[in-house]
């Protein structure tokens, strides 16, 4: 039923070749990161074949981080992806570096315009030159510049004060502070860039007491992935693409949320290309579900849009049966409430 709704799909009739397995399990969580906590609890006692499938390899990184810390074996089949080399990861690590060393003019020039403070390139270059000449921070040099507007000086001082607070936070809080309080999310939204990587970074930072440890942890995780590609562990972490043609006894679909899978919800698809991408996302979600041989578990995140999972929930047999029962009950009630029909008058009585 799910894949049959794809408008660009050739009509096919799919018939099962085996009996019914266990019903689809829906795990309801409040937030995206709660999926990782649930899966980590599963991983602790995983002794039989269990696959966690996802669209983007970065979705698995918080779970991999926890498994590494706890010494839980796993097999990773997702490739390196683009997460570690992405501009967003580079920006966050640069901002953390600047928070620890406000004299790093090279880093400052890479990020000064991403905080929402209207610093011109000429002003930024002057601040760097003055910082190197006088040995002061770039913020001190900028705020002391002749002709700087009072409002800009106040904004720069506030930004410098905010960055100075970062080293006293854990890395997860620091990522969220940069994102929400220091303007980085607004910058990404203005550029129409994906903000999903920010949540992954924040989750990875939760177990790091200070932000300065985050860049090193990212490098460590990047190297770790290469060491688990051929592991024989029962816990398998794989992209859906890598799982095509394979089946697993038990499957969990991770991050089936709007913005990830699908990349864009159906209501937001306007152009033919966007619609085709949405249909491709439907097929990918279907592929993920059908990798389950015996058990399938989906997450429904209350704090996120989950249009594909909602559609599955709507069409679960028990929900369809309940709707049909309600419709029948409403029909019976309407029939009972209707006034009795008037008897027909014989034609012979009509004058």
Language-model regions, residue ranges each:
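Short, conserved phosphate/pyrophosphate- and ester-handling motifs at nucleotide-, phospho-/glycolipid
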Residues: 3-7, 120, 245
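Conserved short internal alpha-helix adjacent to the catalytic or cofactor-binding core
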Residues: 80-116
